[in-house]
């Protein structure tokens, strides 16, 4: 399949803002592949359309930043001066390369047009290049691709290298296109995607005529992690009880979400970003290996513990453990980790359609019970032990007063609050559900992405000291909600400045526009209405709590979250 045929439809998708038209154009693309291509082509275009060449569960990236792409573009014959001027004018490196493509060295008239397969496999190889001369090799490969490409192709190649297609397409739109073209139930398609995290595989199976509901490759599998189910905000414990009848309360831990997979004695542990962190936490791996369980997927919260007090250490200590590549055992002696398991998603078969109460029974057979109302003495004793693997502390009750006691106790041992779950609910990967709620004592912190950075003043003059922060809407468009600089230490500023220099897209002098890759957790005095920002809200006195290296743009808060927090706080006043 010619890459140009794909790019023509990408161009149509980019030029419309209407969701239904984007869906129709992707249906047109599927039909073109059905007639002229191979099943694997739908796999490739499904991933490329959302700016990826790897499936999400693979947790691989092309690994090329804007600076390296600029270096590659310069070797094609486009001058740095012209390129920077065009980027400033258009705000997009892809469009800039397209507009300047007449300056790119010409190849022989007898050269073959670029194929989709060739472009796709070439970009996958980029991620594998390592060693002393790796940057030169990457520049040469990118340069050769751009020289072979026509102007429109060069636009999309440049964007894909940065994993940002800028065409307004997302997974739900592709799934809607699959549903329309192949005449399959949209909910079934969404559910299968949720347990595979592989839009390309799903597309390839559909166009090949697979019975997707009974295809074992499309079922939940050990060592293929899934996105976590997410909780809703709730104004109060009483409101959550109304929604969930007799709910299951659990301590909301001050830690990082993890998935533990085990099969044939092998253990892998994944972060909420689906990163394989197994090698960073060897002591947890060894403990899990000791337990007589196999062919299982567990979910829990990994907490860095102060064993002398039984309380959690700062969240950054968890990230220090997860990032560690050397002297891991020495770091393990300094920072003890513990996992509180709260769900089992697979045990010899998929369990996500099984009610929570039954999944919890399986979990407790493996790790024991921790019922707060009847086992408090045991729980408080074990908190101070060196035990590494626990079932989460829980309370089943519809008594709001008892629930508030449990909430206050959870705070007293250093954690964030409580989770409130419907015991009859299934597990819905990657969705924010109305069967699970969270309650915290203070305003909900927000996870935001940095979209611009500005050089600091005074003591901060050597770093980027102020950061424009944004949340996303349902279509994954970003909306600015404020600027933040307070709360960052000099070490934070130094680390952020280094990252900014690697991911800046456009230099405006004292300010730079960035790829949306830095996630910050921020607190604030309140959310207020504001005409300054298009979204209509702004954070008052935002302050950085921590840099969330365990999260990506997929994990940031939404415009709906902001509105909900605003409404909750307004009703409390």
Swiss-Prot record:
Group of enzyme by EC: ligase
Catalytic reaction equation(s): ATP + (deoxyribonucleotide)n-3'-hydroxyl + 5'-phospho-(deoxyribonucleotide)m = (deoxyribonucleotide)n+m + AMP + diphosphate
Cited InterPro entries: ATP-dep_DNA_ligase (IPR050191), DNA_ligae_ATP-dep_bac/arc (IPR022865), DNA_ligase_ATP-dep (IPR000977), DNA_ligase_ATP-dep_C (IPR012309), DNA_ligase_ATP-dep_cent (IPR012310), DNA_ligase_ATP-dep_CS (IPR016059), DNA_ligase_ATP-dep_N (IPR012308), DNA_ligase_N_sf (IPR036599)
Active-site residues, Swiss-Prot/TrEMBL: 252 (n6-amp-lysine intermediate)
EC number: 6.5.1.1
Keywords from the UniProt entry: ATP-binding, Cell cycle, Cell division, DNA damage, DNA recombination, DNA repair, DNA replication, Ligase, Magnesium, Metal-binding, Nucleotide-binding
Coiled-coil positions: none
Gene Ontology terms for molecular function: ATP binding; DNA binding; DNA ligase (ATP) activity; metal ion binding
Biological processes per GO annotation: cell division; DNA biosynthetic process; DNA recombination; DNA repair; lagging strand elongation
Pfam families listed in its UniProt record: DNA_ligase_A_C, DNA_ligase_A_M, DNA_ligase_A_N
Cofactor: Mg(2+)
Family annotation (PROSITE patterns): DNA_LIGASE_A1, DNA_LIGASE_A2, DNA_LIGASE_A3
Residues that hold ATP according to the record: 250, 257, 272, 301, 342, 432, 438
Annotated PANTHER family: DNA LIGASE, DNA LIGASE 1/3 FAMILY MEMBER
HAMAP family associated with the record: DNA_ligase
Family to which this protein belongs: Belongs to the ATP-dependent DNA ligase family.
Name assigned to this protein: DNA ligase
């Amino acid at each position: 399949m010619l890459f140009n045929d794909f790019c023509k439809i990408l161009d149509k998708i980019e030029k419309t803002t209407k969701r239904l038209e984007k869906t129709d154009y992707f249906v047109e693309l599927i039909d073109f592949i059905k007639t002229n291509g191979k099943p694997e082509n739908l796999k490739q275009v499904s991933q490329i359309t959302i700016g990826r060449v790897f499936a999400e569960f693979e947790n691989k990236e092309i690994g090329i930043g804007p600076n390296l792409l600029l270096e590659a573009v310069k070797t094609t014959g486009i001058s740095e001066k012209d390129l920077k001027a065009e980027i400033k004018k258009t705000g997009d490196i892809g469009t800039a390369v397209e507009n300047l493509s007449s300056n790119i060295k010409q190849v022989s008239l007898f050269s073959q047009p670029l194929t989709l397969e060739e472009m796709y496999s070439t970009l996958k190889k980029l991620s594998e290049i390592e060693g002393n001369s790796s940057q030169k090799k990457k520049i040469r490969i990118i340069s050769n691709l751009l020289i072979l490409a026509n102007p429109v192709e060069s636009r999309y190649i440049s964007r894909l290298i940065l994993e940002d297609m800028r065409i307004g397409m997302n997974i739900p739109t592709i799934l809607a296109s699959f549903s329309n073209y192949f005449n399959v139930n949209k909910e079934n398609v969404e559910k299968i995607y949720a347990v595979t995290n592989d839009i390309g595989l799903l597309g390839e199976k559909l166009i090949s005529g697979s019975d997707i509901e009974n295809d074992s490759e499309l079922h939940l599998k050990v060592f293929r992690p899934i996105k976590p189910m997410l909780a809703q905000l709730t104004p109060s414990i009483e409101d959550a009880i109304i929604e969930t009848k007799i709910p299951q309360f659990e301590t909301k831990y001050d830690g990082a979400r993890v998935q533990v997979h085990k099969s044939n004695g092998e253990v892998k542990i994944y972060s909420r970003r689906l990163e394989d962190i197994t090698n960073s936490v060897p002591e947890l791996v060894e403990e899990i290996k000791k337990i007589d369980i196999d062919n299982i997927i567990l979910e829990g919260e990994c907490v860095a513990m102060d064993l002398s007090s039984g309380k959690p250490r700062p969240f950054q200590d968890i990230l220090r453990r997860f990032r560690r590549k050397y002297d891991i055992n020495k770091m393990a002696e300094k920072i003890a980790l513990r996992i509180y398991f709260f769900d089992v998603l697979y045990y010899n078969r998929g369990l996500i359609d099984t009610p929570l109460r039954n999944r919890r029974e399986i979990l407790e057979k493996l790790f024991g019970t921790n019922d707060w109302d009847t086992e408090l003495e045991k729980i408080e004793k074990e908190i101070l032990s060196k035990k590494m693997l626990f079932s989460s502390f829980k309370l089943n009750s519809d008594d709001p007063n008892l629930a508030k006691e449990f909430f206050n106790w959870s705070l007293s041992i250093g954690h964030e609050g409580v989770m409130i779950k419907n015991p009859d609910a299934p597990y819905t990967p990657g969705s924010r559900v109305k069967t699970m709620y969270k309650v915290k004592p203070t305003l909900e912190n927000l996870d935001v992405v940095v979209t611009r950075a500005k050089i600091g003043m005074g003591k901060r003059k050597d770093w980027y000291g102020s950061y424009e922060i944004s949340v996303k809407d349902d279509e994954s468009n970003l909306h600015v909600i404020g600027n933040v600089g307070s709360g960052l230490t000099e070490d934070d500023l130094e680390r952020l400045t280094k990252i900014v220099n690697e991911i800046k897209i456009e230099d405006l002098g004292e300010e730079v526009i960035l790829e949306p890759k830095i996630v910050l957790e921020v607190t604030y005095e309140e959310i207020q209405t504001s005409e300054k920002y298009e979204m209509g809200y702004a954070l008052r006195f935002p302050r950085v709590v921590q840099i969330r290296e365990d999260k990506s743009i997929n994990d940031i808060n939404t415009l709906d979250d902001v509105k909900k927090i605003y409404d909750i706080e307004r009703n409390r006043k």
